[in-house]
């Protein structure tokens, strides 16, 4: 028998787990709009208070994937998603979005799943729009973009229409729920590799093991000790690495890669326009902390995508494509593709 919403709520009140298959049943009911807003908010609160388990997160992610509009990709070699849970409150420029162009220029296929602002002054969708890109591409257009430019940006509302059911509840609650950690787990292109930033140290090991359960090939889940949901320049970064079916947890520091430490305040921006300006400076290879943090994160993406043999090798490759203009050319090609694709309908 499927678990009822009332039974699920009772479990959370008693700090007991909703098992994987039960979570699948429950999430299907929620995504179909069969559970009242009051009950959804109660369950989300209960899960948050008792802390979501690996099985609960994996079960919920399985259903979100099931309900998504997929991007059909035949060749997933060297494919990677560079994504963060957001919510770190750092208000930095769009580091992962900038790293996307560098990683693509370096030989990865970047299938980035994103949305509007959560923790930065502008989310990945906001940043791409500020750069002139059209973000609301249909799944077949994203697949074509990936094939032609090495980049496919999947705007979450286009690919997860069922999320409209819970949007009003999430908006009214105004606090983090399980849905904040599900987004990065539900890439519509099925990227087998992922560089994921998280907003809390506990999530490093949890999300790496959720990805393991969901069948990911390789992953780096990262949290900077200064609170950033990226590999950080301002402090050490906790890493949960999934490779060869095993999860290993360790810590890295910018000095390990010959990069000078720099406080995250040097990366802060006030709005999307400032974020755009800093991103373009990086892609134009202007030296400074912004360039360094993008090279670090793009290098990690190239490593997890299997293009580079190590993060250090990935950083070398990232700096090469920044210096020779390939990363900037990748941005220009992507923006042009999105504009042409939508103009053609």
Curated annotation (Swiss-Prot):
- Could you state a single Gene Ontology molecular function term? magnesium ion binding
Q: Which cofactor does it need?
A: Mg(2+)
Fetch the Pfam families from UniProt: Glycos_trans_3N, Glycos_transf_3
Recorded GO CC terms: cytosol
Q: Which keywords does this Swiss-Prot/TrEMBL entry list?
A: Amino-acid biosynthesis, Aromatic amino acid biosynthesis, Glycosyltransferase, Magnesium, Metal-binding, Transferase, Tryptophan biosynthesis
GO BP: any one term = L-tryptophan biosynthetic process
Sequence positions that bind anthranilate 2 = 170
* Binding note for cofactor: Binds 2 magnesium ions per monomer.
Q: Where does 5-phospho-alpha-D-ribose 1-diphosphate bind?
A: 84, 87-88, 92, 94-97, 112-120, 124
EC number annotated for this UniProt entry: 2.4.2.18
Which pathway does the UniProt entry assign to this protein? Amino-acid biosynthesis; L-tryptophan biosynthesis; L-tryptophan from chorismate: step 2/5
- Binding-site positions, Mg(2+) 1: 96, 230
The superkingdom of the source organism is Bacteria
UniProt-listed Gene3D superfamilies: Nucleoside phosphorylase/phosphoribosyltransferase catalytic domain (3.40.1030.10), Transferase, Pyrimidine Nucleoside Phosphorylase, Chain C (1.20.970.10)
The record lists anthranilate 1 as bound by 84, 115
Determine if Disulfide bond is one of this entry's keywords: no
**Reactions mediated catalytically:** N-(5-phospho-beta-D-ribosyl)anthranilate + diphosphate = 5-phospho-alpha-D-ribose 1-diphosphate + anthranilate
Binding locations of Mg(2+) 2? 229-230
NCBIfam families, per database record:
trpD
Any idea what job this protein has?
A: Catalyzes the transfer of the phosphoribosyl group of 5-phosphorylribose-1-pyrophosphate (PRPP) to anthranilate to yield N-(5'-phosphoribosyl)-anthranilate (PRA).
Q: Which family does it belong to?
A: Belongs to the anthranilate phosphoribosyltransferase family.
Quaternary structure, from the entry: Homodimer.
Which named protein is this? Anthranilate phosphoribosyltransferase
Organism of derivation = Xanthomonas campestris pv. campestris (strain ATCC 33913 / DSM 3586 / NCPPB 528 / LMG 568 / P 25)
């Amino acid at each position: 028998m499927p678990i009822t919403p009332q039974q699920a709520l009772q479990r959370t009140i008693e700090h007991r787990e909703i098992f994987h298959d039960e979570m699948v049943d429950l999430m299907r009911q929620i995504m179909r709009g069969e559970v009242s807003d009051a009950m959804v908010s109660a369950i989300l609160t209960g899960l948050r208070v008792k802390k979501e388990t690996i099985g609960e997160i994996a079960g919920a992610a399985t259903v979100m994937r099931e309900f998504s509009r997929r991007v059909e990709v035949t060749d997933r070699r060297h494919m990677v998603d560079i994504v963060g849970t957001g919510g770190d409150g750092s208000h930095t420029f769009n580091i992962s979005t900038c790293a996307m162009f560098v990683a693509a220029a370096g030989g990865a296929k970047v299938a980035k799943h994103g949305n509007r602002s959560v923790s930065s002054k502008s989310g990945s969708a906001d940043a791409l729009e500020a750069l002139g890109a059209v973000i609301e591409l249909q799944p077949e257009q994203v697949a074509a973009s990936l094939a032609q430019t090495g980049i496919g940006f999947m705007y979450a509302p286009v690919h997860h229409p069922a999320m409209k059911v819970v949007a009003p509840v999430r908006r009214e609650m105004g606090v983090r729920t399980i849905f904040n950690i599900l987004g990065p787990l539900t890439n519509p292109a099925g990227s087998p590799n992922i560089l994921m930033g998280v907003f809390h140290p506990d999530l490093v090991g949890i999300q790496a093991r959720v990805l393991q359960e969901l069948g990911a090939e390789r992953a780096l889940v990262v949290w900077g000790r200064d609170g950033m949901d990226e590999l950080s320049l301002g402090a050490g970064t906790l890493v949960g690495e999934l490779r060869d079916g095993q999860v290993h947890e360790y810590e890295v520091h910018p000095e390990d890669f010959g990069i000078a430490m720099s406080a995250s305040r040097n990366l802060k921006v006030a709005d999307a326009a400032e974020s755009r300006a800093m991103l373009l400076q990086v892609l134009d290879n202007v030296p400074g902390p912004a360039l360094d943090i993008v090279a670090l994160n793009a290098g990690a993406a190239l490593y997890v995508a299997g293009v580079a043999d190590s993060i250090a090798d990935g950083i070398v490759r990232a700096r090469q494509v920044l210096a020779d203009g390939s990363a900037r050319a990748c941005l220009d090609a992507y923006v042009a593709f999105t504009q042409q694709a939508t103009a053609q309908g």
